[in-house]
């Protein structure tokens, strides 16, 4: 998976600069991002603090790992069911 280009702190700084009255286009150009990224960040992170964003990203990563674990265990379970069924 591709690593995020912007940290939580950078995203929050961009959001706060625009909230402070600067133009989206100017802030995005200065920070190397796109206007589309800004609007995605605004809808996802608007009103959050840096610690909230970090906690949310940690939970998203944990959720991804748990889903992978669940898929692996489900596959193991199906294989074991087939083995038991063949032995009976």
UniProtKB/Swiss-Prot annotation:
Name the record gives this protein: Low calcium response locus protein S
Family: Belongs to the transposase 8 family.
GO BP: any one term: DNA transposition
Taxonomic lineage from the root: Bacteria, Pseudomonadati, Pseudomonadota, Gammaproteobacteria, Enterobacterales
PANTHER family: LOW CALCIUM RESPONSE LOCUS PROTEIN S
InterPro entries, sorted: Homeodomain-like_sf (IPR009057), Transposase_8 (IPR002514), Transposase_8_domain (IPR052546)
GO MF term set: DNA binding; transposase activity
Pfam family of the protein (one): HTH_Tnp_1
The gene coding this protein: lcrS
Keywords: Plasmid
């Amino acid at each position: 998976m591709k690593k995020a280009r912007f940290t939580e702190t950078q995203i929050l700084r961009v959001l706060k600069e625009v909230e402070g009255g600067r133009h989206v286009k100017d802030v995005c150009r200065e920070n190397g991002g796109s206007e589309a990224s800004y609007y995605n960040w605004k809808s996802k992170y608007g009103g959050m603090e840096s610690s909230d964003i970090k906690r949310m990203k940690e939970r998203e990563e944990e959720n991804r790992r748990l889903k992978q674990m669940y898929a692996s265990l489900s596959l193991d379970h199906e294989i074991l069911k087939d083995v038991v069924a063949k032995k009976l």
